Curated annotation (Swiss-Prot):
Name of the protein this chain belongs to: Glutathione S-transferase LANCL1
The entry's keywords: Acetylation, Cell membrane, Cytoplasm, Membrane, Metal-binding, Transferase, Zinc
Subunit structure: Interacts with the C-terminal of STOM. Interacts with the EPS8 SH3 domain. Interaction with EPS8 is inhibited by glutathione binding. (Microbial infection) Interacts with P.falciparum SBP1.
Phenotype for residue 322 to A: Loss of glutathione binding
Length: 399
């Protein structure tokens, strides 16, 4: 882990250190808010210049135009400036020209551009176009009967798109029955694989992606179980206790002595502290398990995740969401919003401070340096989210 991160140069939380960032109620100080806002404006200008040379055919949320639209929708929600809505509109149109009819997910497939477009048209009071996008989104379910189940390319990533629409419309635009039907498919698929590979006694559910049993949030078990425990998926109490909980407990047993988690079952190298692989993604599963099952052990493991991230989370890979410092900082915000413990808000602010020095640490330049999940757009999204910490949610993943 240590060789993939910069040593954390910051002192950990104490009350007097935190006073420069937020008050006793957790509201950011005007000075720190201004620093964040100034950096957001500066990075947006850099990003817009950089996007002129981005791949014109990539419409995805992860590395393409839909992701930039997600950022501008978020900035519109945070700052209320209609100019951001217009910018989002331009990127939505570009993303809709890039649909591939191959993948169904929010981040890497057609569901992202369609869901984002539906929400954007709704905000612009263009309900006819919004409805058209929703219809197309619902029909995507038929594209790939052999889709995997994970977040980036699988059924969970499709479910996120459906929930994203319902949340932003404030009404059930996507019928609950449609969401539950996909959820049932995910559960059945997990039971079948667990039986086939002799996992059932240890873990009643099992999922693979490219012949590997991934553990993390992006491709693996933690991301899938985080969703299966969401109230909006309406998994029955019986199945939550008989299928999901023992499967979550199996993931908990994979924890390294450090408090981190392996990228795959059977991989004993304790290296990756990313949202996609490791503690920064697993923490969401643990917190959701604590909310649903009210067992202290899940919270203890989540605290351990946060300590690993504080120590090893300032990544040499960069400042992005998927495998970067901004994505890792969201773990602190999630824990803060659960516990109201100011230590975690402070840690998020310190990781934001690191991001305020974007490009000055000698990090690796990502393949898509301005994108939502690998690059600058994701960092901007995080800095804007931190302005109102209680509303912060890891984009395209956290509910």
């Amino acid at each position: 882990m240590a060789q993939r991160a910069f040593p954390n140069p910051y002192a950990d939380y104490n009350k007097s250190l935190a006073e420069g960032y937020f008050d006793a109620a957790g509201r950011l100080t005007p000075e720190f808010s201004q620093r964040l806002t100034n950096k957001i404006r500066e990075l947006l200008q850099q990003m817009e210049r950089g996007l002129k040379s981005a791949d014109p055919r990539d419409g995805t949320g992860y590395t393409g135009w839909a992701g930039i639209a997600v950022l501008y929708l978020h900035l519109y929600d945070v700052f209320g400036d209609p100019a951001y809505l217009q910018l989002a509109h331009g990127y939505v149109k570009q993303s809709l020209n890039c649909l591939t009819k191959r993948s169904i997910t929010f981040l890497c497939g057609d569901a992202g551009p369609l869901a984002v477009a539906a929400v954007l048209y709704h905000k612009m009071n263009n309900e006819k176009q919004a409805e058209d996008c929703i219809t197309r989104l619902i029909h995507l379910n038929k594209i790939d009967p052999h889709a995997p189940n994970e977040m980036l390319y699988g059924r969970i990533g499709y479910i996120y798109a459906l929930l994203f629409v319902n949340k932003n419309f404030g009404v059930e635009k996507i019928p609950q029955s449609h969401i539950q039907q996909i959820c049932e498919t995910i559960l059945t698929s997990g039971e079948n694989l667990a039986r086939k590979r002799n996992f059932t006694a240890k873990s009643p559910l099992m999922y693979e992606w490219y012949q590997e049993y991934y553990v993390g949030a992006a491709h693996g078990l933690a991301g899938i179980y985080y969703y299966l425990m969401q109230p909006s998926l309406q998994v029955s109490q019986g199945k939550l206790h008989s299928l999901v909980k023992p499967s979550v407990d199996y993931v908990c047993q994979l924890k390294f002595p450090s408090g981190n988690y392996p990228p795959c079952i059977g991989d004993n190298r304790d290296l990756l502290v990313h949202w996609c692989h490791g503690a920064p993604g697993v923490i969401y599963m643990l917190i959701q398990a604590y909310k649903v099952f009210r067992e202290e052990k899940y919270l203890c493991d989540a605290y351990q995740c946060a300590d690993v991230i504080w120590q090893y989370g300032l990544l040499k890979k960069g400042y992005g969401l998927c495998h970067g410092s901004a994505g890792n900082a969201y773990a602190f915000l999630t824990l803060y919003n659960l516990t109201q413990d100011m230590k975690y808000l402070y840690r998020a602010c310190k990781f934001a401070e690191w991001c305020l020095e974007y490009g000055e640490h000698g990090c690796r330049t990502p393949d898509t340096p301005f994108s939502l999940f690998e690059g600058m757009a994701g960092t901007i999204y995080f800095l804007a989210d931190l302005l109102v910490p209680t509303k912060a949610r890891f984009p395209a993943f956290e509910l």
